[in-house]
Amino acid sequence: PVVNGYVQFDKTYYVKNKSKAALMDSLRNYVQRELVDGEEQLSQARITEVSPDSGIIAASIEEYMYFKRTNWQIHRVRFYYQLVFHVADGQFDVTMRRLHYRYDPEVTAGEFNDDRRAENWITDEAALTKNGTKLARVSGKFRSFTIDRKNEIFKGAALATGAVVKRKVTRVVEVE
């Protein structure tokens, strides 16, 4: 979704019987352990603000996003984004914003040193084919991997706090 011209993902989670302080502690620990100190994180990943009074946790994250990884080939970009949690008693909102990508110039041939903003790569206008039915080859890859990563982060935050995460149920019907 585009908010004020920028790609931004938002979600609200409800956690029964958890205080604001307990949620703040759980989320801060999750962000530190999984996003700042995680195995794919790079040097700029850090928690930028923790404000217990206003219930805000903010983090600037830099990590590798791998499109393909084999013994002979690595296709990855540096993925930058900002996470902001607004915490209250029994609930929290999570926002992922300021998304952009950058290829490593030392491992990527060609002119890929530019900063690629999500607004130019993963919106419907950029990532879908002209008829709007399929993902485009290059920008569609950015879109699907970004949304998968967003879902993983949001689900991890929900599980860290004990929020109920709805699972998709698939029903298989056999017909003779």
Give each language-model segment a name.
Residues P1-E176:
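Ser/Thr-rich, low-complexity intrinsically disordered terminal regions
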